[in-house]
Amino acid sequence: MKKTKTNSPKGQNEQSAHESASILNQTENPKIRLENITFIYGKNSPFEVRALDGVSLDIHAGKLTGIIGHTGSGKSTMIQLFNGLTRADEGRVLLDGQNIWEHPKDIGKIRYRVGLVMQYPEYQLFEETVYADIAYGPRNMKLSEGEVRERVEEAAAFTGVPDDIMDKSPFDLSGGQKRRVAIAGIMAMRPEVLVLDEPAAGLDPGGRHTIFQGIREYNRRTGCTVIIVSHSMEDMARYCDDVVVMAHSKVLMAGSRDQVFARADELEAVGLDIPQVTKLMLLLREGGMPVPAGLYTTAAAEEALVEIFEAAKREREGRRIK
C-alpha cells in the first residue's frame, strides 16, 4: 500500500507527524481518520487485553468499506470508536479532520453524524409499530412529521420493508424483517457515516442478499460513507469498494478491493481467503488465459469466460476462412 507523508498541522509534534505518515489507505481528505489508536480492556488489571494496538487508518468519503478479521482481531472495538461510543486510551479519531473528542460535551452530535448498527439490532426494537420504530430517531431530531414520514418511507424502501407491515408490531415479524426494520431506523436519521456490525449475521442467503443489496443501493444513491464489518470474504468481494483486513489487534492491510485481494498469500497466512471464483480466475490467468482482473462473482466470471471462448471461436473461424 502506498504510504505518503503529510504535512503536520500547526502545533502537532514530530511523533504525530510520524504517525500520520504510516496511515493505511491514506487519502487527502478522509471522512474518518484513526491516528495511532490503542484501546485496552481491563487496563492496569491482571485481565488486561490490548484490543487495538497502534492502529492508523483512513476511511474514504462516499465509499463502501468492508472490515474483516477473525473473532478477537479488534474490528468491533474499532467501529465503536468512530462515533465515540467508546474512547481510545491513546490516539485520535478524526471526523472530517476534527477530533471527535475535542469538545466532549458535544459527543452526542457526533452520534447523529455517525450512525452505528450493532450486531443483532433487532433486539433493540421496542415501539408498538414498525413505523414508529423507524420514525423514533427522526422524531428525536425534532423534524416535522412530514419530513419524518419522508425519511421513514425512504429508509423502508432501501431495506425492503414493505408498506403493509408498517402498522404491525415489530415483534410479530420474522427475524429477517426485524433486522431490516432496525437498520431502516438508523438510515432514517440520514447519518453522514453508516456503520454496520455483521448486518446479515444469522440470515439465510436470500436475506443476506436483500440486506446487502439495500445497503449498496443506499450508499450509491445517497453518497453516504458506509462501513460494514463482516466475516465473509464473499460479501467483501461482492459489495465493497475498499477492504480493511485486521489481525492481532492491528490493521494488516487496507486499500481497494482489487489491491487487497491481489495479496492472496498474505490473506491465507492469517486464515482468510479470497472468494473461490476469484481464486479460480487467478489460476487461469497464471496458466495464460486472458482473464480480466477483478472478477468476484460467479456471474461476472461466467460472462468473462463466455467472451473469451467466443473470441477464440471467432479467431478459429477466421483462420479457417483464410
Q: What kind of region is each of these model predictions?
A:
Residues 146-164:
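Conserved ABC ATPase "signature" region
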Residues 92-109:
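ABC ATPase NBD Q-loop/coupling interface
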Residues 83:
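Helix-to-loop junction immediately C-terminal to a conserved catalytic motif
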